[in-house]
């Protein structure tokens, strides 16, 4: 194909659960540089409620078609919610694409696992899309974010979530992070502040951020994220928690059991700001209690 007809960028824009491609297509047109080839697959509202595998296959197929049509063109990806989870799966299966991808933008994607999904399917029995949204894909995603320049954008309407997805579950090592106050989960696709954050991110080349310095807080966060059955929680609930241990640097570990018997753990820094929130279901409470006791000695 003549270089005259070649686009400057390929822009993928992927919608999420219970949605069509309309708003994500509109967002892509708002933020895309001139002469961009936009690909915004419509997965179908009903199909987003069940099995993730056909959705991953469909997005992957659209990607292959675009790459074959326009080889060696820089690629930018925008994905919201379930769409971000899908793209993490697609990229994990196609590592050879990573060098061609200029940036990845995730809008309110529960990569660490959705707390609502875990409540719907607490034992992972396979209740619709909850089975897949409740999974922790952070280990997969952080291999990607270490290589591909990534922006995470999350809304904040409750102090710890966008009303649907916890802020904690969207956080990834190496990713640039923007939290937009007053923006709910559904409006991430249309909020002017979100579109502007994407444009600013794209204005100049960005590199993946280095891993955070090792501190008691970062060590505790990494430690608790490995506890079996743990899911990122709403940090706003720290207001109900009690201190169970204080560390030498002023960091505190706090716990809370809600009205449904769900056991929470929080890490609060010396400035009294919650840095991590997680919870386990009933079957994993003993494991979390053991982890808390070990943390008191390890850190």
Where do the PLM segments sit?
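Typically the conserved alpha-helix immediately C-terminal to a functionally engaged Cys/Sec
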Residues: 27-28
